[in-house]
C-alpha cells in the first residue's frame, strides 16, 4: 500500500494512535506495555555542549535556548551528578532490552597488513537485534518514552533507525510513526508495515523534520531523532546508548588509537566520544582515541576548513544512511575534541572498499565500507601511523542496502 504524502498539512494524531497500518487504517492491536525502567538517581538533567547551562529533561529536544539567542544551534547532553559511582553512567538501569550491544570486535590481521597498520578491528554492529547500531540508541529512547509515559515514538529515518524503532516500539507496547521518503527500500517498508508502524512519505528532510517537530508537540509523542533545522541531533538521552561501544572496544581490543565512523549528523560519533570521555574522567584510559568521521561528500570537511557550522552542504550519494546536507555541533565536537577530523569518500571508492571487505568475508552497507577507503586516505596522508591500533565501525551489513549488489568497479 502507498503511504500518504502529507505536504506540510498536519492534523492532530488520533487518540487511539497506539498502532497503525501504513495505509492509515487503525489496527485493533492490544499489547502489554513494558514497565517503566529504573532511572539513574544520579541523572540530574540535560547540559549544553557549548555553554554548560543545565536544563530539565523533557520529551522534546530543542537544544540550548541560551546559545540559540547568541546565534548558535547546540544540542544538549545527559548530565550526571559528580558523585555518580559508575565509570560510565547511563540514564537508565537494567530494564527494557532486546539484547543490543556487546557486538564483536573482529580482528582482521590480513586487512591490517594490507592497509599498513599494526591492528585493524571491525566493530560489527550488524549483530544487533535489527541489524544496525541504531538499536543501541533506540533501546535507551524507548526507556525514556516509558519513563515519561509516552505512547508513541516518532522519527525521521531513511531505513535503519525506522526498522529499529518499529521493532523496539512493538516489543515495548508503544506505537511508532516514521517520516520517510518515497524510495524507502522495500525490505524496510515491509518490516514497518508488519509491525504496525505508520509511514509518512516526504520529498525532503525539511518535510520530514517538520512533521516530526509537529508530532513532538502532542502529548504522549516522543521524537527519537532530529527535527530541527539547523540540525541538532537525536534525543540526548537516547544518544547515550552509544557510549558502551567505547568500553567494549577497550575491553575487547585495547585502547584504539583511531576509530573510523560513518557519519550523517554525528549521533554515533558523539556517543562514542562521550563514552571514551567518561573512561578518561574515571582514570580508565590516559587519552582519547582520534575519531575520524566519514562522509559521502564534503560537509563537516567544509566546516573544519572554515565553513559555517549551520550551513547547508547538499550532495548526491548512494550511501543513503549517511546522506543529508547538515552538520551538527555534535559531530564537530566529536572530531575536534579528539584531534580527529572528517574524511570524504565517494561512492566509487566505497564500492571498491566493499569488494575488498567481501573478499575478507565481511558484508557491509556502503557507508560502512567507506570507512575502509577512509583508512587508506588517512594512511596515505600519514594521519594514521603504521603502528596504530584502528577500529572501523561496521554500522550495518549489505542485506538491506538499496545500492547492493554493486556494479563492477
Which positions does each model-derived feature cover?
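A broadly conserved sequence feature marking short terminus-proximal activation segments
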Residues: 2-54
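N-terminal juxtadomain amphipathic helix
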Residues: 37-105
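Positively charged, low-complexity intrinsically disordered leader regions
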Residues: 83-150
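Short glycine/serine/threonine-rich phosphate/pyrophosphate-binding segments
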Residues: 135-139, 154-172, 186-189, 265-272, ...
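A short, small-residue-rich loop immediately preceding and capping a beta-strand
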Residues: 141, 145-168, 172-181, 257-268, ...
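Small/polar-residue-rich loop-to-helix segments that shape phosphate-bearing ligand pockets
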Residues: 177-255, 316-332
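Active-site/ligand-binding loops adjacent to catalytic centers
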Residues: 207-226, 230, 278-366, 407-409
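Phosphate-binding loop/pocket of nucleotide- and phosphate-handling active sites
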Residues: 309-316, 370-409
Amino acid at each position: 500500500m502507498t503511504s500518504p504524502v502529507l505536504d506540510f498539512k498536519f492534523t492532530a494524531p488520533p487518540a487511539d494512535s497506539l498502532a497503525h497500518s501504513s495505509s492509515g487504517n487503525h489496527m485493533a492491536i492490544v499489547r502489554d506495555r513494558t514497565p517503566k525502567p529504573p532511572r539513574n538517581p544520579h541523572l540530574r538533567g540535560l547540559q549544553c555542549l557549548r555553554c554548560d547551562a543545565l536544563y530539565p529533561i523533557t520529551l522534546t529536544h530543542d537544544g540550548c535556548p541560551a546559545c540559540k539567542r547568541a546565534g548558535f544551534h547546540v544540542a544538549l547532553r545527559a548530565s550526571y551528578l559528580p558523585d555518580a559511582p559508575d565509570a560510565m553512567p547511563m540514564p537508565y538501569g537494567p530494564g527494557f532490552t532486546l539484547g543490543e550491544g556487546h557486538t564483536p570486535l573482529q580482528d582482521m590481521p590480513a586487512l591490517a597488513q594490507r592497509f599498513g597498520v599494526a591492528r585493524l578491528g571491525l566493530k560489527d554492529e550488524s549483530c544487533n537485534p535489527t541489524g544496525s547500531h541504531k538499536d543501541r540508541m533506540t533501546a535507551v529512547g524507548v526507556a525514556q518514552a516509558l519513563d515519561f509515559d509516552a505512547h508513541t515514538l516518532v522519527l525521521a529515518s531513511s531505513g535503519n533507525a525506522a526498522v529499529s524503532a518499529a521493532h523496539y516500539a512493538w516489543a515495548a507496547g508503544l506505537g511508532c510513526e516514521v517520516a520517510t521518503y518515497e524510495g524507502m527500500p522495500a525490505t524496510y517498508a515491509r518490516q514497518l508495515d508488519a509491525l504496525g508502524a505508520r509511514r509518512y512519505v516526504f520529498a525532503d528532510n525539511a518535510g520530514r523534520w517538520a512533521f516530526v517537530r509537529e508530532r513532538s508537540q502532542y502529548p504522549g509523542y516522543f521524537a527519537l531523532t532530529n527535527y530541527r533545522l539547523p540540525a541538532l541531533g537525536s534525543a540526548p538521552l537516547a544518544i547515550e546508548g552509544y557510549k558502551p561501544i567505547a568500553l567494549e572496544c577497550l575491553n575487547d581490543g585495547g585502547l584504539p588509537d583511531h576509530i573510523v565512523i560513518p557519519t550523517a549528523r554525528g549521533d554515533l560519533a558523539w556517543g562514542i566520544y562521550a563514552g571514551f570521555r567518561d573512561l578518561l574522567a574515571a582514570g580508565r584510559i590516559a587519552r582519547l582515541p582520534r575519531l575520524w568521521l566519514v562522509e559521502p561528500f564534503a560537509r563537516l570537511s567544509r566546516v573544519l576548513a572554515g565553513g559555517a557550522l549551520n550551513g547547508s552542504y547538499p550532495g548526491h550519494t548512494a550511501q543513503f544512511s549517511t546522506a543529508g546536507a547538515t552538520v551538527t555541533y555534535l559531530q564537530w565536537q566529536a572530531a575536534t575534541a579528539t584531534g580527529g577530523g572528517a574524511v570524504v569518500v565517494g561512492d566509487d571508492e566505497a564500492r571498491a572498499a566493499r569488494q575488498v571487505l567481501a573478499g575478507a568475508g565481511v558484508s557491509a552497507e556502503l557507508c560502512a565500507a567507506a570507512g575502509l577507503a577512509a583508512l587508506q586516505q588517512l594512511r596515505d596522508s600519514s594521519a594514521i601511523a603504521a603502528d596504530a591500533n584502528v577500529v572501523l565501525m561496521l554500522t550495518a551489513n549489505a542485506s538491506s542496502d538499496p545500492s547492493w549488489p554493486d556494479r563492477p568497479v
